[in-house]
């Protein structure tokens, strides 16, 4: 039972919860009530004040970069009571610093259109999309998910761990932006924890992950996609043993939504 429960709680909370700390960022806030411009003689201090008069508060590193001052200027302003420092929690972002150009949906072939039109997103049923790598299955997934999102529902996409490459995730990010959460073993425990919370808090509308992502706290599922459904990794041989497809069927019946399998064999 304890092994099963571990699948349903945030990564890291089972035994090392004290080791996972929230990530914070140092911010600066302007204290207008203590501001007396007649006492500010430093041009560098005025640069910081002018920036904060427009923004009130901002990340300290951003202020440093924009105003081109040193931390000594902050210290001087803090001593005068003009600014305060505070820490603001920020989520770890597995894609931080990575630019993915936004993409528009592609024109579907007649065969792809036929496949998409035959998937009823309003009720439970199982569908199999067959096609070798590069045949266009992913574009069908993307346009199916777009239809689901337009109804106000969410989508879950499972991919074998070995196939969960940056190329795959980049295609989804390019189409849907930051409403995506990723869950796989190559993320740090802190990144997985924050992605889990992003899903739980309703900030993610699409979850992409390996086998265990089937237990992500995603609500209001409108479509569940299992890519490369023939892959043996979807069956867990370790405790707790489970068959991902069986769990997926249960979820789709519960949410009355389609279960879509993709296969190249």
Give the positions of each predicted feature.
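Accessory, non-ATPase domains that flank or precede helicase/AAA+ motor cores in DNA-metabolism machines
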Residues: 1-263
């Amino acid at each position: 039972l304890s092994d099963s429960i571990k699948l349903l709680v945030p990564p890291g909370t089972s035994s090392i919860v004290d080791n996972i700390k929230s990530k914070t960022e140092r911010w600066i806030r302007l204290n207008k009530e203590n501001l007396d411009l007649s006492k500010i003689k430093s041009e560098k201090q005025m640069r910081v004040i002018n920036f904060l008069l427009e923004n009130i508060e901002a990340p300290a590193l951003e202020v440093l970069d924009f105003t081109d001052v040193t931390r000594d200027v902050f210290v001087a302003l803090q001593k005068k009571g003009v600014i305060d420092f505070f820490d603001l929690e920020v989520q770890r972002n597995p894609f931080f610093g990575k630019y993915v150009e936004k993409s528009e949906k592609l024109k579907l072939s007649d065969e792809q259109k036929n496949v998409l039109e035959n998937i009823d997103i309003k009720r439970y049923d199982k569908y199999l999309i067959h096609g070798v790598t590069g045949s266009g299955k992913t574009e069908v997934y993307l346009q199916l998910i777009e239809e689901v999102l337009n109804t106000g529902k969410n989508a879950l996409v499972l991919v074998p761990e070995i196939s969960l490459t940056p190329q795959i995730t980049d295609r989804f990010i390019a189409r849907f932006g930051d409403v995506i959460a990723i869950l796989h073993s190559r993320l740090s425990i802190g990144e997985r924890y924050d992605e889990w919370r992003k899903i739980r808090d309703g900030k993610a509308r699409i979850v992409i992950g390996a086998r265990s992502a089937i237990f992500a706290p995603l609500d209001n599922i409108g479509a569940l996609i299992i890519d490369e459904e023939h892959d043996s990794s979807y069956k867990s041989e370790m405790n707790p043993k489970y068959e991902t497809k069986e769990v997926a069927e249960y979820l789709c019946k519960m949410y009355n939504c389609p279960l879509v399998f993709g296969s190249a064999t």
